Amino acid sequence: MLCQRLTLAGSHLLKSGENMFQHKQVHELAELEAITTEVGRVYKTPDGAFPSITTILSRLSRDDINKWRKRVGEEKANKVSRTSSSRGTRIHKMCEDYINNKKPDIRSPLDKQMFMSMQEILDGFVGEVYGQELPLYSKHLGIAGRVDLICEWNGKLAIVDYKTSAKLKKREWVNSYFMQATAYCIMYEEMTGIPVDRFVILIGVDQEPPQTFYGKRNDNIADLIDAIKGYYDENNLIHSNPSLFDHSCS
């Protein structure tokens, strides 16, 4: 599992020419309705209602977040959370538009700095695009979610997940990101038959070059299954595939 802080020459909002990123229509996946319930965000799928992978993984950082909220106070914590969430949404949309060969809507200098640093990485590594913001689910895992990007990254098919941060991250701080991307790898293969065995976590960082973490699906499956089991147990839910929890997933 590697982390690289990458910069490439050039600063521009669009590459020259049209159809800069080539899109490959592999499978048309049906949209999934998402609802908010007492146990978090849930997607309605043809095989049942499954919790969002982000909801499942959020419980892993709950204690640390609660300690932070007590330390800084509810008012400041709410403000920081809103600001972070809004920025993340904006940066995700900019990256999505850019990969769709549209000019991103950039409304602040800080957003511009972060997006353009990530854009340089996208320019250098993204090849053929298999899909963006695809709704995914797995009956085997009993989860669902929406993946940011599936593409050829430096010539090999990969899941790409965008994140934003106010500061640089250490590898040990992003275990949940690795589990989330692993879940997308498994869900995509289950729905399409196309295996994806690697992923990229691209993190835009305030006033810093972006960070790029690389990982392999099979290195994170056991941790992912433990997280899913913890969520189902905590909420007294019945899993559609109980045998999953003997770590038989491969």
Model-flagged regions — what are they?
Residues K15, N19, N66, N78, ...:
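Detector for Asparagine
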Residues R107, D111, D148, T212-G215, ...:
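Generic preference for flexible, low-structure residues
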Residues L2-A144:
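Metal-dependent nuclease catalytic cores that hydrolyze phosphodiester bonds in DNA/RNA
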Residues Y130, L134-L237:
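Mg2+/Mn2+-dependent nuclease catalytic core
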Residues Q4-K24, W153-N154, A158, N236-S250:
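DEDD superfamily 3′-5′ metal-dependent exonuclease/proofreading module
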